[in-house]
Amino acid sequence: MKEYKVWAYARSAASNLPALENQLAEVMREADRRGYIIVNSCMEQKYGTEFWRPDLFAMLTAVQQGRVNAVMVQSLDRLSHDITILYRILRFLQNYGVALITTETNLQYELYLTGLESRILARTARTGKRVPWEVAVDAD
């Protein structure tokens, strides 16, 4: 099993700070349960349609610098609600060989529903880079 160095990320546009803190805590608990190394974490109260988010860019910088090899979120929409932004983030993760891991949803199914799975798979075939998601296999 691959050793993941994870950046735990939480985002919500709602002004309910305890709910956002709980979202991040749940992601971190799941990372710990799976035996991942939590390198850093962040949470931000921003809209999912915004691309220029300070904590998102801090996480992407960590990816670029090789400090993490996985990003862990509750679900795909925690990264963005905008398909174009999601595709940019996924391409970025793929370029750096970083896995995206979700804790509460089937990421591959979410990508299929948004139409992004086929785009990423086509890009994978063209570039030879691995897919930027992790298919979790639970022993439970």
What name fits each language-model region?
Residues 1-140:
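Short, structured surface patches at the beginning of a domain
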